[in-house]
Amino acid sequence: MNNAAGTNGAGAEVAPLIELRDVVFSYAGHTVVDGVSLQVDRGELVALLGPNGCGKTTIMRLINGLELADAGAYLFDGHVINATFLKDSVASQRFHQRVGFVFQNADAQLFCATVGEEVAFGPAQMGLSTDELKCRVRDAMELFQVSDLVDASPYQLSGGQKKRVALAAVVSMNPDILVLDEPTNGLDEDSCDIVVSFLLAYVAAGKTVLMSTHHQDLVRRLGARAIYIDRYHHVVEASVPSYGTESAAAE
């Protein structure tokens, strides 16, 4: 993708990596996202919090291009992401390589016969050398401790194992931003520790993370910037200990 105007040159303002401007999205006649605006800069770790039905998952899907806004605008790295943009096969492929999305339910994204094939599928589409592909797959599987499952069927794994495989499959593509819908749901304490350590290292390396969660302790542990979305779709920057009693009642 070409650089957006105004983002190059000494002293030039750099566009946010993610920007939603008054985004509206409806499903089956019901407004799910109503005028939401937010920004995520490069190198940030941002957590979306809020009650069920506030639109967190839909926002994630909009950012990944799985849904398109009915009104408003979504910009990624200064580029408007809309139907016209996504019809450009080259631009669309590059966009989806740069934005890694992990579903809350890992079953929604696992489709290969073995774990090894699952983790290799994404980077295999990137024109990498055989050695680079093998290295990416090996490193991602080791990172999320699923190397011993290389020949296993993803469908026979536990929920926590599936989540770690899904993370490895996305991380193997080395995206610029990880968009994670409830990344620690269904994970035991050890698996949570693996994910937390990875996310901290990922952001320290200059990458970006946007995640949804209901767990305040996870947000505090990660030192994430918290964005709270209430049931009326109001977006509020908030400190984790006081972002609203409404969220405490969620899930």
Per-region residue spans from a language model:
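Catalytic Walker B motif of ABC-type/P-loop ATPase nucleotide-binding domains
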Residues: 178-181
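The feature captures the beta-strand-to-loop junction immediately N-terminal to the Walker
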Residues: 49-51
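H-loop/switch region of ABC-family ATPase nucleotide-binding domains
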Residues: 213-214
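Conserved ABC ATPase "signature" region
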Residues: 131-149
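Conserved ABC transporter NBD signature motif
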Residues: 72-84, 95
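Conserved ABC ATPase signature
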Residues: 153-157, 161
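Helix-to-loop junction immediately C-terminal to a conserved catalytic motif
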Residues: 64
